[in-house]
Swiss-Prot record:
Its main location: secreted. Six disulfide bonds may be present. It is found in: Secreted, Cell wall. This is Snakin-2. Residues 1-23 form the signal peptide.
Length: 104
């Protein structure tokens, strides 16, 4: 009788231990999936996007430099050669010290 109680207690303890190990592994898999999703956020090609954005600019070097800075901070460049800033609110919100729009 004493052996069966000890066997039952050790079996119960083993099951609880296995449950804890499984829950820890599930948490690790979930956190790894979240961190992989954060790293899978791809950087855009700022050079190509800014070249397209600044192709009609009268000062293309200045435009490309400003656009590149904005793209590096926001990881987006609005489509087209001007306007369309609603597609990239971060790009539209950056300003100079004089409160002028920084991004072309």
């Amino acid at each position: 009788m004493a052996i069966s109680k000890a066997l039952f207690a050790s079996l119960l303890l083993s099951l609880l231990l296995l449950e804890q190990v499984q829950s820890i592994q599930t948490d690790q898999v979930t956190s790894n999936a979240i961190s992989e999703a954060a790293y899978s956020y791809k950087k855009i090609d700022c050079g190509g996007a800014c070249a397209a954005r600044c192709r009609l600019s009268s000062r293309p070097r200045l435009c490309n430099r400003a656009c590149g800075t904005c793209c590096a901070r926001c990881n987006c460049v609005p489509p087209g050669t001007s306007g369309n800033t609603e597609t990239c609110p971060c790009y539209a919100s950056l300003t100079t010290h004089g409160n002028k729009r920084k991004c072309p």
